[in-house]
Amino acid sequence: MADRAEMFSLSTFHSLSPPGCRPPQDISLEEFDDEDLSEITDDCGLGLSYDSDHCEKDSLSLGRSEQPHPICSFQDDFQEFEMIDDNEEEEDEEEEEEEEEEEDGDGDGRAGGGSGSQELSGESLIPSPSIEESHKLRPTTLHLTTLGAQDSLNNNSNGGFTSAPPSSWQETVLRSPVQEPLKELPAPLLPAEEEHHEVQSLARPGCDCEGNQPPEPPASGGASPSSDPGIEADLRSHSSGGHEGRRSSQELSSPGSDSEEAGGARLGRMISSISETELELSSDSGSSSGRSSHLTNSIEEASSPASEPEPEPEPEPLHEPPRRPAFLPVGQDDTNSEYESGSESEPDLSEDADSPWLLSNLVSRMISEGSSPIRCPGQCLSPPAPRPPEEAASQANPVPQDCPDPEAVAGPHVELVDMDTLCGPPPPAPAAPRLGPAQSGPCLFLSNPTRDTITPLWAPPGRTARPGRSCSAACSEEEEEDEEEDEEDEEDAEDSVIPPGSRTTGSTAPLDASLVYDAVKYTLVVDEHTQLELVSLRRCAGLDNDSEEDSSCEASEEEAGATLLGSDQVPEDASPDSPDLTFSKKFLNVFVNSTSRSSSTESFGLFSCVVNGEEREQTHRAVFRFIPRHPDELELDVDDPVLVEAEEDDFWFRGFNMRTGERGVFPAFYAHAVPGPAKDLLGSKRSPCWVDRFDVQFLGSVEVPCHQGNGILCAAMQKIATARKLTVHLRPPASCDLEISLRGVKLSLSGGGPEFQRCSHFFQMKNISFCGCHPRNSCYFGFITKHPLLSRFACHVFVSQESMRPVARSVGRAFLEYYQEHLAFACPTEDIYLE
């Protein structure tokens, strides 16, 4: 019997899916949790788009059922199991008796036992007004046999069986309550007819021991209780081929021979349970029906022991599943495949309708029950041609016409490997009832680059599975050669070797174990003695070329001049219209993308511009966004430089927005005063004795986590250069005049257009913490500044046609003189203690 722990594992099952199974469009950055940078990603259009909880989706999908049908949610089942948990042992004994009575064909005795258990459970409960109704709508056992979904295609009747205590969470999922197929129910049951109908469905005169009924057309007038319209259409349209489909279903239900009917019934119950769980979790009943029923057919083919591969033409390379499981990638299907998904909502169905973790456990359970896998994965894909009855009987493909349109079958790229059953050779005989206790079953993984296919993966004899590497690299090149030698007599040549032109989900080279579930890779090395490597956003499917071939500075040194190409190859997902796709969250370029203004590095320095022919510096900085509601009000955005011209008595300021060039009034508390130039002794005594000017090009600024270090400086340079190469043809770097003095560094930007107003940023020398050129390319120069008020740091990067070492020496000289004068003022060394 299933207990509360099993039902809880079923209800929380989808929340345990790996984070790699997600849609390819999804570029969410969950590796970093910088709270102060979340607003920038929202403004840039990136958005931290997390997938909603799978349990939440399940509850929504269960609530979208149009017609009332008796499918219970996992939460309701959990409550019902909790109510009648005390009678579990009594009902276990009754189910054993009922199973014996069912084999003898005594249907009346089973019905009596079921009603007895119903009375016992009803007496032990606290009386409530609706307790009798709820138990009338439920079956007489804890199997919930009144329900069913996709297993109506299987024609498997389910008897009771007792399950051992769960040993692992995989076994817990497999031992879910057995469901009753819907095909034998003409209409939704009424309370008065339920007991009589259950006697007929569980033990019929014309059924064999497994409950397979003789072929007879379904009732045309009764409405099907299934909420899946695709299954209803298939049942009505393919009722003419009942003999062939039901004959193959009977063969599927009994693996091997008639002496193994108990194992076949257990397989049928397992497939019924898992298939119904998948239907309850499907979010879109219309589009998921074809996929789910197609998955059921694939599972049945894998459970058939006598399935012999039909001679088929050599499949195309794109239709061939990969031989080695690599990881759980997130990626799109082949665009040139004929099985490409035609709807945008298909990726959403992969988490609910396909239930890949359920399928992996189902397949491993089928192997442990003694079935052998299919030899040719192509049998699950294309509808086979009409065959004679003898050939159809030997070919285990129930209801071959049930395969929907191939475009409806296509799904996202999912590759799944079972963790526990990786080792073990293929069974010697196709009808082996059960593997030895010390020999684990072979590993089957679901691989559907363009469709759902169950493909076997055999480990060589004598090898043990390494659980840590079963998802990343299940077998190396040497293991592949051993596999090919072992399977030469059993599998075709096209199944043993991957064609060179076929698309594989991972790299052809063995992948490292650290790449498991690594959908998005970021590398930021800040150690000064380590080779710096900053990798942009990429999928793990392209890990063979994910690192930049050349650093940004090396490439520009080779190409000479102010070339901004940071690497020889531009990422595929990068486009000039969306330059933020390659931005990591540690380094956000805020000057390159002018639309992102919150948390910008413009607030690190003092902004100045020409106002009425005179250069004026900002006096305030906007801390909130202000939307004007009257013509005389001034629009403000966060970090806008503001020149306050007048302060009103009613706490309103009249000022000039240096970013927009507009004047108006705004609330006084929407802007804070910024610390102006140093009014100390150093600044008031004399003007700077010297000023150095350099003509350079300004690339951008980026926020950095530390205030100094060559690693930080080089990482910021490479990040900005890599980002600028995407927009260099749209917005070339602005020419900039650097003025270096004892007061600080002043950036005067000037554009080519007449509408561009000349502006400048001033960084006080006391806020400059680090500067230098790139160690391998002196054309790049940058310096790190501290925010005047906050504990934040930003790096500003420049490039020039010539070496920028004179700029670095000038800044170093100014800093040294400023530091000496500051020490002389702050810590005077007078001979006050000498006599």
Curated annotation (Swiss-Prot):
Phosphoserine modifications at: 257, 304, 307
Quaternary structure, from the entry: Forms homo- or heterooligomeric complexes. Binds specific components of the JNK signaling pathway namely JNK1, JNK2, JNK3, MAP2K7, MAP3K10, MAP3K11, MAP3K12 and MAPK13. Also binds the proline-rich domain-containing splice variant of apolipoprotein E receptor 2 (ApoER2). Binds the TPR motif-containing C-terminal of kinesin light chain. Binds the cytoplasmic tails of LRP1 and LRP2 (Megalin). Interacts with DCLK2. Interacts with FGF13; enables the interaction with MAPK13 and may regulate the MAPK8IP2 scaffolding activity. Interacts with TIAM1 and TIAM2. Interacts with SH3RF2.
Region (Necessary for interaction with FGF13): 242-509
Biased composition (Polar residues): 142-173
Compositional bias (Basic and acidic residues): 233-249
Protein name: C-Jun-amino-terminal kinase-interacting protein 2
Gene3D superfamilies: Pleckstrin-homology domain (PH domain)/Phosphotyrosine-binding domain (PTB) (2.30.29.30), SH3 Domains (2.30.30.40)
Disordered: annotated span: 1-26, 44-357, 369-509, 544-579
Domain PID: 688-824
Organism of provenance: Rattus norvegicus (Rat)
Biased composition (Acidic residues): 77-106, 335-354, 476-495, 545-560
First-listed, main subcellular location of the protein, grouped into a coarse class: cytoplasm
Family: Belongs to the JIP scaffold family.
GO cellular component: cytoplasm; neuronal cell body; postsynaptic density; protein-containing complex
UniProt-listed GO biological process terms: behavioral fear response; dendrite morphogenesis; excitatory postsynaptic potential; JNK cascade; mating behavior; negative regulation of apoptotic signaling pathway; nonassociative learning; positive regulation of stress-activated MAPK cascade
Compositional bias per record (Low complexity), positions renumbered to this chain: 117-131, 219-230, 272-307
Highest rank taxon of the organism: Eukaryota
Protein's job: The JNK-interacting protein (JIP) group of scaffold proteins selectively mediates JNK signaling by aggregating specific components of the MAPK cascade to form a functional JNK signaling module. JIP2 inhibits IL1 beta-induced apoptosis in insulin-secreting cells.
GO terms assigned for molecular function: JUN kinase binding; kinesin binding; MAP-kinase scaffold activity; protein kinase binding; protein-containing complex binding
Keyword line: Cytoplasm, Phosphoprotein, SH3 domain
Domain SH3: 615-676
Region JNK-binding domain (JBD): start-end pairs: 111-278
Cross-referenced InterPro entries: JIP1_scaffold, JIP2_SH3, PH-like_dom_sf, PTB/PI_dom, SH3_domain
Regions that span the bilayer: none
